Amino acid sequence: MNWSELKNSIPNDGFAQKYEVYRRARPTVTLVILRTVTDPILFRSSDPERAETQEFNGIIHAQVNGEKFVSKERLTGLNLCRELDENENIISKEYTYNEPINSLPKSQTADMLTYGLAGTVSGATFSQKSRVIEGYTYGLEPYDLMNKEAHNALYESGTMRDESGGQSESFFHPVKVQPGTHFVHFVTLEAGTKEMLLYVIHNILGTGRYGARETRTGRDMKNEIVGLITYSADSSLRCGEL
């Protein structure tokens, strides 16, 4: 299937006719995503050793800010842009995630137009609001705060004592979200185009590492798109409504 056939296979409902900075119409497409934990994940909060929590019917569940997912997925998208780029037609070599550059034209990438950006040019600030709306999500299974791991920092001796015999105090006890935990997450594209939806879907399905220390632990989550809702107005949902 080529690019045109792929776009034509998507229903027209829920999309803007074209990209516009001013959103005179706000149709939406909401993706229903099932995120399944496949390896223990640490989602840090104000407590660096555990996730936020929410209690439903007397049972504690892990609560995760949607930005913790989307921030990783944006990196997947930027990698795609760089793979497809020739002569900086898609993305400037200076563009990096979360580090605005002093040039509005060089900041205009698929990442910026879809997920938004704020920066400064010649002393004046500019911002592009995100077309992607992501809310909190909660683990469907209980979150056991007593299931703690024990980690320490070893010296080159392979023990917790340095050359002088001093004892290291680098102990920490993370409470990770365990394999088999499921998150139902709603991600909404507002006043977006079909190209933006395909970009967002690629980023979701192409990302499998989330949470703290993911560069050392590998893939820890599987994402599946299990539903899609389109509407001429706001179709966004919140997991707390389930």
Residue ranges and their predicted role:
Residues 1-242:
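RNA-binding basic/glycine-rich loop and surface signature characteristic of RAMP-family CRISPR effectors
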